[in-house]
Amino acid sequence: MSFLEDRKALTREKRLSALSHFHGTLEGLIDETSGTEIKQRVRTYSQIHVDETIYAFDVLSKIEDAAIIVNGAIGCGNIGLTQIDEAFGWYSTNLVERDTILGGEDKLREAVIRAYEEQHPKAVFIIGTPVVAINNDDVNSIILELEDEIGIPIISIYTDGFKSKTPVTGYDIVTHSLLKYLIDKNPEETKPFINVISFSESIEDIAAIVKSLKALDIKYQVLPRFSSIDEIKAASKAKATVVLNPEEGGYLARELEEVYDVPYIVTEAPVGFRGTKAFLLKLAAYLKVEDKASKYVDEVEAELTRSISKHLLDGKKIFIDASLSRIPAYARLFTNLGGEVVGFGAPFVDLENRNQLSKLRFLSKGITAVIGNGQYFEKANAIAKGEVDIYVSEFQGSSFASDEGATVVSTRNKSIYGFDGVYVLYDSFVKAIRLSGKLQGADKGNYKISWKSKSGNWYVKQEVS
């Protein structure tokens, strides 16, 4: 059943029973997430973390011909400062205390007109914040009024920053608004390209996948990240859709299939040799270019076999902190290189991505599993207990692992997708191993020994309804 009749997307907690509080073992996590609903837990102590507003802003900021307005106080308006591109610009309504009482509609109207006159965008996105959600400002009236005046789509992104503990909800909210207000609802014909859905991947990751698609002569468009408004509108005309990270883009792919009959080719994340091979062969089978794809994959495999030592990580204990959809691919790759995965962390588990846990059954069932958005103090506890040699992370804030004596391999701003990503990860490990000896006697970290001697799930409790 399509969710597009709803005004906005449900949170992951409501739609898919997302769990973002767990600290235990792989076996325990599989057991707790195996029912028709996932048993919820809470953290009685929690570190600060990102929210869905930040995730929504991040993906919208990569759409090339759109203007973004952060409708809220100046603190929320500053989220654009995280952008690396100094030329990137956005707008804030800069709501103050008076606006929370009398309403901020006039400031929003002014911001929309200014954005249109200065940037001449093809669409304007208005991102919600806690102040607007609490005030319940009439954003839709402003949209209806100004759309007639300026003649382009003005789209409300119904984020609030506090109703969900799962930031990926921000991607769902963006997806819902794009489907409901922007994508062409009456495609006249199917075009000879596929949709490649990307929400969080770097431009380097996209380039690695595009390299393989071009080798197979597959026409494509990437969306919504690094796309244009016209490309997003054309998503309903594609011959098929693939998703680079299923737990982020699956919602968009399924709705395109259900509402617009664009087939969704379900694949795993194209990380590592096996993951990339499975991704390409599944796509090639649908597009009937299997022979070409098989030849291409065989050539790449032969080159990888010549270039990579399968004993690089012998004797190394590894903790993986990443999106759950990518952890099985990481774990396979690191195990094939001789490493031992002793634990992992992921932001959430829900009814859809929990199938990734079964792909980890080749690991010891007693390895540590930490589910939470951030929560580095718990991961420091796990690293200290597990005597981890290498901490692999997709996220910001990895210095705590170095403080615990682990060598950090960060995949942020690196191309880890596709076959090229195997070389990038391999080279990163070579450098990490070279540096690991220099960390002997490293500082024991910012977290007290008394905390690290406690059970890692000290603050994680069963939710009582």
Residue spans for each PLM region:
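An N-terminal assembly and electron-transfer interface module characteristic of large anaerobic redox
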Residues: 1-465
